[in-house]
């Protein structure tokens, strides 16, 4: 046996090598998705900068590939993961506050809206402390992935049939994605996720007994910390989207926190409680963001509530006499909390039809007409997928989404947009006002409702195609209410906030710039990447750069597919898993094609790839005279072409290159660059990433064309043998 391989972990030779490659590939994707989901929940920086964990995982995996001939010591990633858990999930309140303060430390101005954003400029010392904390967490993520990259690379490099081995790698990755998705579907907590992850990491160690007593105790401490992270909550559940905790309040009311931040309440406005508390009754009668909008509607026969949450908006609709209510909520656990805990039992009413779906997807497909449509304080504290830089509510607050809502209104129907606009982000309220004015050709009725007991405050914007809305709004009673409840910020006819569209859906970004917090964190990643790979990356070999740009282009292609198809099928976790499955299956099909032919000329394939990307960019998909699902299927089929071509190019180049570990490492590091290049969408829009991907692939093609006779990259094991 090669002594170098013996140090690397899993034995890559022998009859069980295929199974070992499958297990290592499964573990790599499983741990990657786990870190993306968990860090985005427990450390808010990783929730707001959605693909940060993904890029760090790629950096660690790629570095491991480059260093597969000199792998890290035993239990290297096991120790890194245990330290990461202990740092991030330590159940000490003061420590949690320090972690939350990291967001404020990195948020150097108000060009990007996050909760707990400071209104004053951030001190340099606070910024440096926050940057150091983020750097430490990123290093632990990278360290966790390094051995996994080394093991996968060494398995591939030892294989006699590289294309078959790569197919096994893809299949293991596919099962890893669905393995974690299954745990999310069952609402299992992180202690289960990490128990499986630690078991996988220990299983792949060459000498498990090296863990020792200290390692075993550390593992138990990690699991204990994960189990202790529930605090004082009545119930803690990990839904497919987020961590949800229920805290009991007074008068049969509850607070629901999402990813450790206050999110929503379950209010009690039953007649019995109002009769017992005259002060509360008077506050309620004076007006609130839930009940007051119904006073502006002429009819309430058919009501749509998107983002119905735990049922407060549904209860308000029932209190105000709605005949039928379609209540749309994306998170089944939040809906379950409302059904179980809401004192008014709104979801049990025969007038209510609950729909578990993405709000935008429902509106695009619905053919119903409504007297009132309410956007029920949708606000995302998390993301559905860290494979793109989208939040789950990104496509809900775009011009096209408001136009979908307008289409669903009856001739005299009323649209209500509620949003909690916080200082210093008045530009968000100005954006809503301006967009609605343009869509309805009339300024909306706008007012602000303060908090009433558990009913949260909100800026309220009311629009209609029918002028009777303004006749009602000018009645003495409603006119006085609007005058007494002005918005707490000025409304400008020319707001400096960019209108959001399906191509630029960044509600929480002020303008077409890369927010300073993103630039700060990207700078940290670039610096870490340079320091870690400068001695391993073969800068002077042309093939290295070819695979680098292939990786950059593919990451953009994959994330573009995830974000674009979310428009047609919804931003649900099932959709994301199906899209990733489709991507991996297309790549496996490309492997089969490469395996059937001895040599494929890559010039025409490169040309076809670039042309197909430009075609997807140019076609007016939203104008096709087809249903939403039909257009989505056509777009998915269109994306399969560049995916297939990209798969053929990579696999054929991989087969010819030699030095599987080195080229795979370069490819993964290119994906890191592609992840950072996603930030360009904040300036140029989502579609523009297709052009960037085409440029990356064109550069890779030119490198191949001009270095056709270049020597193959020397394998990592060959380098080790000659040393």
Language-model features: locations:
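Alpha-helical transmembrane segments of multi-pass membrane proteins
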Residues: 1-723
